[in-house]
């Protein structure tokens, strides 16, 4: 029996070493180590052995099984490595070939417009200021010459959080806060971009949340001509170098005098079309000279300092600039919309 086991070990290991595929190795494993294999048959015959021989033969049989199993495992590992090498050799990849292009996103059109305007004003010596979107009643209204019970407050329906705090209805509070920081000493040249909130019903031209950019200049000897020159620069930067602007008298509580600013239609050149509704002009923003009361409440002497301010809706500028007909497109999170503004 001992000789038989050793012979089986030698045969099995020789066949394993000669095998050229994983299937052959598996067949050898089943042939020699399976339930119907010769080693199992030998073990079944151990009952005929004496009590002294039985442990020795059992140990030998286990040793033979381990030797064969070890040879099989080693051969499997060798063949698997060879198979991987063959696959790699047959599936050679040219690493110099261009890969699949990575999908690159596009900046939102509102971001593009805000950054363009910021770059323009920074180049003119302005700084960018920001403020809280949850604002106090004082900075949103009173510091801007809209005291309690002022009739102009009815012009804006607001989202109040408490009796004295609300979501800001304009970015003008940033101007009031900034003026206070200067403690009555100019010059001040700032723009204030940010989100604002009003209780409007959402439709093609209105949104309960939108973006504004306001500008403020306070210094000695500031006049309406300075305001007009600044706004002409903005209009030509945003809508083309041949644009003209006109100022129409208006009313805002925080400026005096106040004006609405129109730009000559960039589609028809002022001849009249559907974009400008036949007038040749398109309204783009409101502006005016800073009201003396606003200067006083912020610590500036209106006898010594003057200033101008202006405010524009970013969505309106973007809609005009890119020919967008519905403000709701800006907030639908539709990648097909933003992809149209992809820049190289």
Curated annotation (Swiss-Prot):
This protein's UniProt keywords: Aminoacyl-tRNA synthetase, ATP-binding, Cytoplasm, Ligase, Magnesium, Metal-binding, Nucleotide-binding, Protein biosynthesis
Enzyme class, spelled out: ligase
Location of the protein in the cell: Cytoplasm
InterPro entries reported in the protein's UniProt record: aa-tRNA-synth_II, aa-tRNA-synth_II/BPL/LPL, Phe-tRNA-synth_IIc_asu, Phe-tRNA_ligase_II_N, Phe_tRNA_ligase_alpha1_bac, Phenylalanyl-tRNA_Synthase, tRNA-bd_arm
Entry's EC annotation: 6.1.1.20
GO BP terms, alphabetized: phenylalanyl-tRNA aminoacylation
Pfam entry (one): tRNA-synt_2d
Binding, Mg(2+): 256
Required cofactor names: Mg(2+)
Position of the signal peptide: none
Cofactor binding, per record: Binds 2 magnesium ions per tetramer.
Keyword Heme among UniProt keywords: no
Catalytic reaction(s) noted: tRNA(Phe) + L-phenylalanine + ATP = L-phenylalanyl-tRNA(Phe) + AMP + diphosphate + H(+)
Superkingdom of the organism of origin: Bacteria
Molecular function as annotated in GO: ATP binding; catalytic activity, acting on a protein; magnesium ion binding; phenylalanine-tRNA ligase activity; transferase activity; tRNA binding
A GO cellular-component term linked to this record: cytoplasm
Assembly, per entry: Tetramer of two alpha and two beta subunits.
Family: Belongs to the class-II aminoacyl-tRNA synthetase family. Phe-tRNA synthetase alpha subunit type 1 subfamily.
Name this protein carries in UniProt: Phenylalanine--tRNA ligase alpha subunit
Organism: Bacillus pumilus (strain SAFR-032)
Lineage of source species: Bacteria, Bacillati, Bacillota, Bacilli, Bacillales
């Amino acid at each position: 029996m001992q000789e038989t086991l050793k012979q089986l070990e030698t045969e099995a290991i020789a066949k394993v070493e000669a095998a050229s595929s994983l299937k052959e190795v598996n067949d050898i494993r089943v042939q020699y180590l399976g339930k119907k294999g010769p080693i199992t048959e030998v073990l079944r015959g151990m009952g005929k052995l004496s009590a002294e021989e039985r442990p020795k033969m059992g140990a030998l049989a286990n040793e033979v099984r381990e030797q064969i199993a070890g040879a099989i495992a080693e051969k499997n590992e060798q063949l698997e490595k060879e198979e991987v090498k063959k696959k790699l050799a047959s599936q050679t990849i040219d690493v110099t070939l261009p890969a699949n292009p990575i999908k690159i996103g596009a900046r939102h059109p509102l971001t593009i417009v805000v950054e363009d305007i910021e770059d323009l004003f920074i180049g003119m010596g302005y700084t960018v200021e920001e403020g809280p979107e949850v604002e106090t009643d004082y900075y949103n209204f009173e510091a801007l010459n809209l005291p309690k019970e002022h009739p102009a407050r009815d012009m804006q329906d607001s989202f109040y959080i408490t009796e004295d705090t609300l979501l800001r209805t304009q970015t003008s509070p940033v101007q009031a806060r900034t003026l206070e920081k200067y403690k009555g000493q100019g010059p001040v040249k700032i723009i204030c971009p940010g989100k604002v909130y009003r209780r409007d019903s959402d439709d093609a031209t209105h949104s309960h949340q939108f973006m504004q950019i306001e500008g403020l200049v306070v210094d000695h000897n500031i006049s309406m001509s300075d305001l007009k020159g600044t706004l002409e620069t903005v209009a030509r930067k945003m809508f083309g170098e041949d644009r003209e602007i006109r100022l129409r008298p208006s009313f805002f509580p925080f400026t005096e005098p106040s004006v609405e600013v129109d730009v000559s239609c960039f589609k028809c050149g002022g001849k009249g079309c559907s974009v400008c509704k036949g007038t040749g002009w398109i309204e783009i923003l409101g502006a005016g000279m800073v009201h003396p009361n606003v200067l006083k409440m912020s610590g500036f002497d209106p006898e010594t300092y003057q200033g101008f301010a202006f405010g524009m809706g970013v969505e309106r500028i973007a809609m005009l600039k890119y020919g967008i007909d519905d403000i709701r497109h800006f907030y639908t999170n539709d990648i097909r919309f933003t992809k149209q503004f992809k820049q190289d």
